[in-house]
Amino acid sequence: MKIIGCDFHPSYQQIAMVDTETGELREGRLEHEQGEARRFYQALQGQTVRVGIEAVGNSQWFEQMLAEMGHELWIGDAAQIRRLVVRQQKTDRRDAKHILDLLLDGRFPRLWVPSQQIRDVRQLLRHRQKLVELRTQVKNQLQHLALNQGVRRKRRLWSVQGRAVLEQLPMQGWTARRRSDLLAMLDRLDEQIGELDRAVRAEAEQRPEVRLLMTHPGVGPVVGLAYVLTLGPTTRFPRGKQVASYLGLIPKERSSGGRQSFGPISKQGNTMMRTLLVEAAQTAVRFDEELRRGYGRLKAKKHSAPAKVMVARKLAVRMYWMLRENKSYAQLYAQRPVARM
């Protein structure tokens, strides 16, 4: 069997490979664009090969190539791999050898890797989220133009009447051109986001677990689908608290000398999922008494931002238990008035 530690970069990779039968070690650098890496792995076809890399961006082509060749790929948690480094000197060669050592010692922090189909649907959600953020930027610019003309409508600016007022505001030359272009962009973005929303609803309807999550107040097709595709199998997480930690919703902790202090949330994990959960939490507190009480208490002590995050964390844990126990919101809430951690 060939075991390969790979320090992956956009244009090249450094490898450390060992043959478990002979003990022979081979190290080298493989360029990507010239096809050197492809030729190297092609030469290993027909043999049992396991490759380990850190979780990095822009590696999808490499993952697909190894799958086509029949090689096994393990993707590891980059932060944990770095924490296991003993030496302070960092080079590509040492990084590749370090990954190889973790693979050989059975200490490689392997991550769950979603299927290509799941990754593709994730692109749908990510594309929608980016367009929503872009639409928000366009709306903010239009609000600024209206404020410069003494018009302050906030959300009412996007009603039929508000839009008419905005279009009729007296503006000169390039200011009027900017307004016209921004309105055209807004219309186009609304159309594109609407199309993506329909695609998200269609994907959500095909998945029973997403429909189950949508029984919880505040959880719609976007949040439910993103949650299922981000979390993967719930069996990966023995406890709800681990889900909150995985999503970066647990406060940072510093404990030393018997003193324990907590800071802001870690913000590790999927940024889009955290954003969606916070947005869903703001709706959930309007319909769920327990969440509303918790939100009110923390908001009174601190302010609304940490209160929203707290509700998002509780919501994430609730959704986890709904999936684990295959229970709807009504069934789960009746059994557990307090969300389990």
Language-model features, listed with the residues they occupy:
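A detector of single, family-specific signature residues
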Residues: 1-341
